[in-house]
A protein has these predicted regions:
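Short, hydrophobic beta-strand segments
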Residues: 92-100
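Short, compositionally biased P/S/T/A/G/V-rich stretches that sit at domain boundaries
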Residues: 2-36
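Extracellular Ig-like/FN3 beta-sandwich strand-entry sites
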Residues: 40, 100-106
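Solvent-exposed serine/threonine-rich low-complexity stretches and specific carbohydrate-binding patches
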Residues: 73-83
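Short acidic/polar inter-strand loop motif in beta-rich domains
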Residues: 110-120
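Aromatic sugar-binding surface patches on proteins
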Residues: 84-93
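Extended low-complexity, serine/threonine- and proline-enriched intrinsically disordered segments
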Residues: 58-74
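Short amphipathic, basic-aromatic surface patches that mediate peripheral association
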Residues: 46-56
Length: 128
């Protein structure tokens, strides 16, 4: 099983020292904290706030996944050069339709050189 890098696994001191490395690899979930049952919810997953990720033939973000707890929801794949062979922030908009139960969303992303990275979880409460 591959090692999964998560923000909680890394000490505050190491995060500060290697801020660019962690920033460009760790997915961030951006969505409303509340959603309506049966209505589309936009969930944006973005890699990095400040530091762009390379988009080279041998070093790029291969895919981004969205999970609700242990349930796989969606996935987007990228080929090398998807960002024009320039460093940038991979962004994906997923649209999901929530059921009646609250969600605990997590995003995963794979860098071809630095492995599997997991976001912090995002709780979404459901309104009827």
């Amino acid at each position: 099983m591959p090692r999964v890098f998560t923000p909680v696994d890394i000490s505050k001191e190491e995060k500060e020292i290697r801020k660019d490395y962690f920033d460009r690899h760790t997915p961030i979930i951006i969505c409303d904290a509340h959603a309506r049952e049966g209505e589309k919810l936009k969930v944006k997953v973005k890699l990095g706030k400040e530091y762009p990720h390379p988009d080279d033939p041998d070093h790029y973000i291969n895919y981004v996944q969205l999970w609700n707890r242990e349930t796989f929801l969606a996935e987007a794949h990228f080929a090398p050069g998807a960002l024009g062979n320039q460093s940038g922030h991979v962004e994906v908009d997923f649209y999901i339709v929530p059921g009646p139960v609250s969600m605990n969303l997590t995003a995963m992303a794979v860098c071809t050189n630095h492995g599997l990275w997991q976001s912090e979880s995002k709780e979404v409460t459901i309104q009827k």
